[in-house]
């Protein structure tokens, strides 16, 4: 049932995300694997997943990325340095967390968030919103 639902969402997102390179920063092996599979089903190319701050910083600096999904807390602390680097490079990112406390620097208060646990539909909706072209006013 779950994999079928992921496939249905993946089919809907396939054209839009098929060439997107998404960095995954997640220190839980189970969550990282599920997230990776969801993104692959959407047609994304997954960079990572990584759960180490130093490696996450290296990939955020050196890889060609279209977006990122980053866990707010990983081994080594809060992911603020990774988020800051992605922001400096103009790479959009989702902050993911299973904690109720979303305390973060003011500059990221309005950032898109992905509460854990999440479904394939929630992830696809968040990515659609994150990667949507700006609406002219």
Model-derived features: where do they sit?
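Short amphipathic alpha-helix used as the core "switch/output" element in two-component signaling
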Residues: 80-91
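Non-catalytic signal-transmission and effector/linker regions of two-component phosphorelay proteins
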Residues: 1-21, 105, 119-137
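Acidic, metal-coordinating helix/loop segments flanking the phosphotransfer/catalytic sites
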Residues: 49-67
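A Lys-centered signature of the CheY-like receiver
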Residues: 116
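Active-site residues of response regulator receiver
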Residues: 71
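Conserved acidic carboxylate
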Residues: 26
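Hydrophobic/aromatic residues positioned on beta-strands within the core alpha/beta folds
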Residues: 96-97
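Two-component/phosphorelay signaling modules centered on CheY-like receiver
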Residues: 29-48
């Amino acid at each position: 049932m779950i994999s079928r639902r992921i496939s249905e969402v993946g089919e809907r997102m396939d054209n839009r995300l098929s060439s997107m390179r998404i960095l995954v920063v997640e220190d839980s092996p189970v969550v990282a694997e599920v997230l990776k599979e969801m993104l692959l089903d959407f047609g994304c190319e997954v960079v990572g997943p990584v759960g180490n701050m130093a490696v996450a910083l290296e990939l955020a600096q050196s890889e060609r990325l279209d977006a990122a999904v980053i866990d707010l807390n990983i081994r080594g602390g809060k992911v603020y340095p990774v988020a800051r680097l992605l922001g400096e490079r103009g790479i959009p990112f989702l902050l993911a967390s299973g904690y109720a406390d979303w305390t973060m620097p003011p500059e990221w208060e309005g950032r898109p968030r992905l509460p854990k646990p999440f479904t394939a539909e929630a992830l696809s909706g968040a990515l659609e919103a994150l990667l949507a072209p700006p609406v002219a006013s």
